[in-house]
């Protein structure tokens, strides 16, 4: 069989996205900056009223000295910008690769092997790992429910496919570390699938959610069956 290789780095249809930011490390500093900005607006408005008016309520209310307010604003703005830059630096980059290889299921039979890697420089931790199957000829409904690797394997078995012979699915539990690959491209096995499986399954989606070192949560949905018909090497932009 002609070898087909498919890289899933940055494909537009299954692009990685940030779905949640850390409340402590992102939301709290941002709220503090907004509050200080509101205080600044109040003090600027108060400074433009007459001295006589400032002797009456509410204009006589001084929340904070201008010098201290300026320093706090500079610190808060710097913290928000530094956090944003650091989050970009340590952001994980999930990628996947599929290739026809031998020895994954039966010794001499070709199987479609799919692996995942973290192309970033820093560690990320698995938060959740879910799957969804679309059999050949079935409708691919975007709102279909997700299930665990175990329930997905049971669904495939009920469809007549044999675990260990037609497919092999790897479960990644919450807390599993995905080490940054650096300059390498070695992948961690997600699953292997026989030619019979490929003929009977239209799509096998894997939804991966990971948490980076600053507490942000990222998600990527990968179709393990994508690119099987390609020949030669192909890389998504």
For every predicted segment, state its role.
Residues 2-127, 131-134, 237:
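Membrane-proximal alpha-helical anchors
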């Amino acid at each position: 069989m002609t070898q087909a290789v498919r890289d899933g780095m940055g494909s537009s249809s299954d692009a990685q996205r940030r779905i949640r930011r850390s409340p402590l490390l992102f939301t709290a500093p941002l709220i503090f900056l907004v509050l200080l900005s509101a205080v600044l607006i109040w003090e600027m408005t108060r400074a433009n009223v007459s001295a006589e008016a400032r002797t009456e309520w509410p204009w006589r209310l001084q929340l904070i000295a201008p010098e201290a307010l300026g320093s706090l604003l500079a610190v808060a703005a710097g913290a928000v910008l530094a956090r944003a830059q650091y989050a970009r630096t340590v952001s994980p980059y999930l990628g996947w690769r599929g290739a026809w290889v031998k020895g994954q299921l039966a010794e001499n039979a070709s199987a479609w092997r799919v692996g995942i890697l973290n192309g970033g420089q820093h560690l990320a931790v698995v938060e959740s790992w879910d799957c969804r199957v679309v059999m050949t000829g079935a409708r691919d409904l975007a709102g279909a429910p997700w299930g665990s690797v175990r329930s997905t394997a049971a669904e495939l078995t009920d469809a007549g496919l044999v675990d260990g012979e037609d497919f092999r699915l790897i479960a990644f539990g919450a807390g599993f570390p995905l080490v940054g690959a650096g300059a390498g491209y070695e992948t961690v096995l997600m699953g292997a699938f026989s030619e019979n499986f490929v003929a009977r399954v239209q799509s096998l989606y894997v939804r991966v959610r990971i948490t980076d070192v600053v507490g942000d949560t990222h998600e990527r949905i990968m179709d393990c069956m994508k690119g099987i018909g390609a020949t030669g090497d192909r890389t998504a932009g």
